[in-house]
C-alpha cells in the first residue's frame, strides 16, 4: 500500500505549531486537504482489497468510512476556495 506512505508523508508535513496568520492557515488547510485525499485513497484500496472477505456490515462500515473521508476532502476544498475568494474578491 504505497498510499499509506503517501499519507504518512502528508501527515508528517503538517506544521507543528498553530498558524500565525491567514496565509499560514490557508497553507495548513491545503496540507490537510492533501492528507484527507490520501486517507480516502487508503480506505478505497482497503475496501477493494477486502471486498468479498468481510461480513456485510463490515463492508458497509468500510464503504461509509471511505465516503466520509471523501466528504472531508470536499469540505476542505470548499474551505480553500473560500479562502481564495476572501483573499481576492474579484475571483
Please place each PLM-identified region on the residue numbering.
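Hydrophobic alpha-helical segments that drive targeting, anchoring, or assembly
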Residues: 1-88
Amino acid at each position: 500500500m504505497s498510499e499509506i506512505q503517501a499519507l504518512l508523508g502528508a501527515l508528517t508535513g503538517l506544521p507543528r505549531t498553530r498558524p500565525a496568520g491567514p496565509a499560514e492557515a490557508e497553507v495548513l488547510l491545503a496540507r490537510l486537504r492533501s492528507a484527507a485525499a490520501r486517507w480516502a485513497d487508503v480506505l478505497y484500496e482497503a475496501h477493494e482489497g477486502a471486498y468479498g472477505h468481510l461480513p456485510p456490515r463490515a463492508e458497509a462500515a468500510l464503504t461509509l468510512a471511505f465516503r466520509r473521508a471523501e466528504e472531508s476532502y470536499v469540505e476542505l476544498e470548499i474551505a480553500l476556495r473560500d479562502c481564495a475568494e476572501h483573499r481576492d474578491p474579484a475571483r
